[in-house]
Swiss-Prot record:
Residues 144-374 form the Radical SAM core domain. Keywords: 4Fe-4S, Cytoplasm, Iron, Iron-sulfur, Metal-binding, S-adenosyl-L-methionine, Transferase, tRNA processing. This is tRNA-2-methylthio-N(6)-dimethylallyladenosine synthase. Coiled coil: none annotated. The gene is miaB. Catalyzes the methylthiolation of N6-(dimethylallyl)adenosine (i(6)A), leading to the formation of 2-methylthio-N6-(dimethylallyl)adenosine (ms(2)i(6)A) at position 37 in tRNAs that read codons beginning with uridine. Its EC number is 2.8.4.3. It comes from Cereibacter sphaeroides (strain ATCC 17023 / DSM 158 / JCM 6121 / CCUG 31486 / LMG 2827 / NBRC 12203 / NCIMB 8253 / ATH 2.4.1.) (Rhodobacter sphaeroides).
């Protein structure tokens, strides 16, 4: 029996890419590949890339450059680039990096085994088409899970065309996976020990199928015996339907956590971004969501230094942050992406963007620390995902997605326990198990 070939995957960017990497590993597993965490051991190295920011894209080329010595030492090593950089740059990757054997876009990775077979004869292959067929129809059934929490992609693509964003160009139009297939995949995950599922999509709350929206899907998933927790990400304010907001109050298995990007608090900048909503619309949404689920923790995304942003625009963003009170937020300086409308506009001075980002992050950090301190003394559910670094310690995620360290010598990965929070650190909480 021949020795199994080894596959190393490096994943960049969003949770969608984490899910895609798992599915690519499963597709190649059907061809005899097993995962390794050591690139030097691999027979194939696959970089699953992100194109949302310029630095993310350039990091891929830097990492490819670091693979040159390995390719020289192992000429039969196959190197592939997948994901959104692959979709955006295609043939250009082969021109810039002769060591790359194949380039596969996010809508084509079900064809990865066939592409790899073609490289065995020396061909260099690019497949960045948007096929008519559903790629999920051609992928093997999910058989492996890496813990009690799993991702499930329910929707791909985006039709919003925000002026700064490449997603509509790299991931295509919004497509919702069929309800029946999602239910079957979720049941399969639970049968393999998964207790928490996070529903994924570039614009996940745009999902619709068979007359259901995302709220209806969540209600049906919650009926699966053994599935204890549900989450979803990432959402657009314009697709927060009444049914979905109601689900936050009505469905106990839907965790009290919501990531709802707003990007700016200035209506003028929101219009320039083509966000199709106002700051007031966002604030009213937050009121309704909190009315449905008062204990919900909210997080968001912000871009500072968007072309044309004035000091007054930036102050409006700070005002919105103060008005909402976020548990955390991802914040970035504007990064022009080729092919997007905003890339044609003059950029702000770097020093202005740097100063604004520091001010925004200081405010968000203050809110994050306050939110975590407010958890001290409260009882929360924690799903253990791994053993801690200290003996007898377990680490898991709370209902609000905080990392929690618990002293629990009898604890096992997959246990869902009640914990009293005893202390707050900058990026995590500590607690004691109740009823042990």
């Amino acid at each position: 029996m021949s020795e199994a070939r080894k596959l190393f995957i490096k994943t960049y960017g969003c949770q969608m890419n984490v899910y895609d990497s798992e599915r690519m590993a499963e597709a190649l597993g059907a061809k005899g590949y097993v995962l390794t965490e050591v690139a030097e051991e691999a027979d194939m190295v696959l970089l699953n890339t992100c194109h949302i920011r310029e630095k993310a894209a350039e990091k891929v080329y830097s990492d490819l450059g670091r693979l040159r010595p390995l390719k020289t030492a192992k000429p039969d090593l196959k190197i592939g680039v997948a994901g959104c950089v692959a979709q955006a740059e295609g043939e250009e990757i082969l021109k810039r990096m002769p060591l790359v054997d194949l380039v596969v876009g996010p809508q084509s990775y079900h064809r990865l085994p066939d592409m790899l077979e073609r490289t065995e004869g020396g061909a260099r292959v690019v497949d960045t088409d948007f096929p008519e067929e559903d790629k999920f129809d051609h992928l093997p059934e999910r058989k492996a899970t890496r813990g009690p929490a799993a991702f499930l992609t329910v929707q791909e693509g985006c039709d919003k065309f925000c002026a700064f964003c490449v997603v509509p160009y790299t991931r295509g139009a919004e497509v919702s996976r069929p309800f029946a297939r999602l239910m079957a995949e979720a049941r399969g995950l639970v049968e393999r020990g998964v207790r928490e599922i996070t529903l994924l999509g570039q614009n996940v709350n745009a999902w619709s199928n068979d007359g259901r929206g995302l709220g209806g899907l969540i209600r049906e998933l919650a009926r699966i015996d053994g599935l204890e927790r549900l989450r979803y990400t990432t959402s657009h304010p314009n697709d927060m339907a009444d049914d979905l907001i109601e689900a936050h109050g009505a469905e106990p298995k839907l965790m009290p956590y919501l990531h709802l990007p707003v990007q700016s608090g200035s209506d003028r900048i929101l219009k320039a971004m083509n966000r199709k909503h106002t700051a007031e619309h966002y604030l009213r949404l937050i009121e309704r969501i909190r009315a449905a689920r008062p204990d919900i923790l909210l997080t968001s995304d912000f871009i500072v230094g968007f072309p044309g942003e004035t000091e007054a625009d930036f102050e409006a963003t700070l005002d919105l942050i103060r008005a909402v009170g976020f548990g955390s937020a991802f914040s970035f300086k504007y990064s022009a992406r080729p092919g997007t409308p905003a890339a044609e506009k003059p950029e702000l001075p770097a020093e202005v963007c740097d100063a604004r980002l520091q001010r925004l992050q200081a405010l968000v950090t203050e809110q994050q620390r306050a939110a975590q301190m407010a958890m001290v003394g409260r009882e929360v559910g924690v799903l253990y995902e791994k053993a801690g670094r200290l003996p007898g310690q377990m680490v898991g995620k709370s209902d609000h997605l905080h990392a929690v360290h618990v002293e629990d010598k009898a604890g096992q990965v997959g246990d869902l326990v009640r914990v009293r929070i005893t202390a707050s650190a900058p990026n995590s909480l500590a607690g004691e198990r109740l009823g042990a």
